[in-house]
Amino acid sequence: MPATLLRIHPENPPHSRIQQAVDVLRKGGVIIYPTDTVYGIGCDVTNAKAVEKVCRIKGIHPDKANLSFICSDLSHISDYAHGITTATYKVIKKALPGPFTFLFEASPKAPRFGGVKRKTVGIRVPDNQIILQLVKELGNPIVSTSVREDENTLEEYVTDPDLIFEKYRLLVDLVIDGGFGGNTPSTIVDCTNDDFELIRQGAGDIEQYL
């Protein structure tokens, strides 16, 4: 069955439409949604079959997938990551919500994708009301990966929800149109060694928070 295209106002998302997207996730669906950077593909972190579907869409094996978790706030972080020092927490609290993915050591509670225990986990709290309200209503983080196929190629379709819908409508269950997205990914920062190591420079400047 083709996906549904759901238009949601980016500044004032109606609760009824957020709930519609949450219902899809709770049924094991895969959705595409806006963030503060590039549109993402994701599902409920607790649904293993949905995670496998996300990986199939991206052409990656679950145990090798670099999937991040989108959280609504910092309260989820301790559930999936450990070893976060007070100094590190102060920095990420200032930086989030924002265009960053922070890498931490995975806690024992972190889901196993493909039956393999994760060593690290990427945490995202995007500055986007649609996805923040969606995750809050769901009550679980969303496993997330970018709709971009090639990080080194400028792909026109990734910024336009209508073009994204045309490309993915037979692969996912729902595409949220929250307006035009960006084409620059999040900045990835490794926090596993009590330091802030820049892995990928993206839309966010971590230096201003250090």
Which residues are covered by each model-predicted region?
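Active-site-adjacent structural elements in enzyme catalytic cores
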Residues: 1-210
